[in-house]
Amino acid sequence: MSKLKKRTFAALLLIVLTTLFSCELNSEDGRWDPMKWTSDRPGDPRKITATAEGGTYQLKCTNYGGPWISSVAAPDTTIFGSSKEQDFRHIKYDWYDVLAKENTFYITLLPNTTGKERKLSIVVTAGDIFDYVEVTQK
C-alpha cells in the first residue's frame, strides 16, 4: 500500500471514529425545565383575568435568568419583540404595555371601554425555552 493510500485510509478512519464517538445518545439538548412563575394573585400566574378598569399585573420567572418577550398577540395584531419599532424587553401598543425587567414581567392594561372582552397572548422565552401568558380583560 502506498503512503498516500495509508494516509487517506487513516484520515477516513479518524473521521468515522470521530463521528461515531462525538455525540451522546443521552444528550440534554432540548430538554429544558418548564418556566416556573410566581405572582401576588391566586391561581395560575400565566392566566390573568383582568377587570374592565385595567391596571398593572406582575409575574416573576423563578428558574430562568432574564427571560424576554418573543411576541404579544391580540386578535387583530401580533407584535414581535425583534421588530424595529419594539424591543424584546418592552412592547407597548394600543391598550396594553408589556415590560420585562430582569425576571419580572409587568403587564399594564388600559381600561376596557368597548364593552367586549379583550384577549392578549404573550410568548416569553429564555433562549430555547418558551412559555405563554394568557390575559383576558372583561
Tell what function each PLM region has.
Residues 2-10:
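Bacterial N-terminal signal peptides that target proteins for export
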Residues 7, 17-45:
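Bacterial Sec-dependent N-terminal signal peptides
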Residues 41-43, 54-106:
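Surface-exposed binding patches on compact interaction domains or structured appendages
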Residues 48-53:
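Short, solvent-exposed loop/linker segments at the N-terminal edge
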Residues 58-60, 104-108, 121-123, 132-134:
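Beta-strand secondary-structure signal
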Residues 102-116:
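Short, solvent-exposed, Trp/other aromatic-anchored flexible loops in extracytoplasmic proteins
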Residues 114-128:
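A short beta-strand micro-motif common to beta-rich folds, especially ectodomain repeats
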Residues 128-138:
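C-terminal edge beta-strand
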